[in-house]
Amino acid sequence: MEVTQEELRHEILHTWEAAREAWVIHLEIAGINLSINKPVWFLWLGAAITFLFMYVGARTLRDRPGAYQVLVEELFRFGRDMFGGQINEEGRKWFPYSLTLFIFLLVLNIIGLFPNSYPVTSNISFTATLALFTFVLTQYEGVRRNGLVTYLKSWAPADLPAKPLMYPIMWFLHLIQEFTKPLTLALRLYANILAGHLIIFVFLSLILYFGLPTAFVSVPFAVVFYAFEIFVAVIQAYIFAILTQVYIELAMFAEEAH
C-alpha cells in the first residue's frame, strides 16, 4: 500500500489531535467552554503527584532517613544549590518555587512518555500560561524590591554615551526583551516536547503504513529516541525552572546591575 507524504502527515496530525480530544467531559458555563479533556486530566494527575511527593516528604522526616527521605533531601539540596542565589543570596528565597516548578514539569514530562498518556507540556496553552506566570512574578518582584520608578529606570544603563539619544533606545530594547523572555520560555518547552513525541510517533507509524519489515529499522530508532526523550524531559524542566529563577533575580537586583 503506497501512501503519499501528504497523506502520512495528515494522518499523523489527525491521530495526534484525536488523542488530545480523548476522554472529554463537555462542560459549558455562561457560554464559556470549560470542557475537561485529556490534557486537563493529565495536568491534574501531574499536580496531584507533585503535591503528594512533596507533602509526604515533608511529613515523614526521621532521624534515620529511609530511601524516600534521602531522595527528598537530595532534591531539596539540589534545588538550594542549583536554583537559589543565582545573582545574590537574597534571591535564594525563591528557590522553593523554582524547585517546585522543576519537579512539576519533570513529572508532567515523564507522564507524557507513558503509552496512551498525553504530554501536557506539548500544549502551547499550558507552557504559555506558566511563562506568563513567570513574567508576572518577575515584574512584581522587581517593582516590590526597587520601587516602580527605580525599576523602570534600571532598564537602561545610567552612564550611556550620548545619553539623550541612546537611553530611550536601550530602554525600548529592554522592554522588548522583557516580553521576549516569557515567549521563549513557552516556545522552547512546547517545541522540544512536541517534536520529540511526534518523531517517536512517526517512527512507529511507519510500521502501520509500510508493513512489518520497516519495524527492524523503526523500532530501534524509536527506542533510542525514547531514551533520549527521558533526557530531554529532565533538561527542559531544568531549563524552564533555572531561567525562571534567573529572571526573577535579575528583576530583584536590577538597580545593582546598573
Curated annotation (Swiss-Prot):
| Classification via InterPro entries | ATP_syn_F0_a_bact/chloroplast (IPR045082), ATP_synth_F0_asu (IPR000568), ATP_synth_F0_asu_AS (IPR023011), F0_ATP_A_sf (IPR035908)
Regions crossing the membrane: 38-58, 94-114, 118-138, 193-213, 215-235
Its GO CC terms are: plasma membrane; proton-transporting ATP synthase complex
**PROSITE patterns in the record:** ATPASE_A
| Molecular function terms from GO | proton-transporting ATP synthase activity, rotational mechanism
Q: How does it sit in the membrane?
A: Multi-pass membrane protein
- According to the UniProt record, which cysteines are disulfide-bonded? none
Cell location: Cell membrane
Matching entries from Pfam families are given as: ATP-synt_A
Gene Ontology biological-process entries: proton motive force-driven plasma membrane ATP synthesis
Keywords assigned: ATP synthesis, Cell membrane, CF(0), Hydrogen ion transport, Ion transport, Membrane, Transmembrane, Transmembrane helix, Transport
Q: Which family does it belong to?
A: Belongs to the ATPase A chain family.
Q: What is known about what this protein does?
A: Key component of the proton channel; it plays a direct role in the translocation of protons across the membrane.
* Assembly description: F-type ATPases have 2 components, CF(1) - the catalytic core - and CF(0) - the membrane proton channel. CF(1) has five subunits: alpha(3), beta(3), gamma(1), delta(1), epsilon(1). CF(0) has three main subunits: a(1), b(2) and c(9-12). The alpha and beta chains form an alternating ring which encloses part of the gamma chain. CF(1) is attached to CF(0) by a central stalk formed by the gamma and epsilon chains, while a peripheral stalk is formed by the delta and b chains.
UniProt name for this protein: ATP synthase subunit a
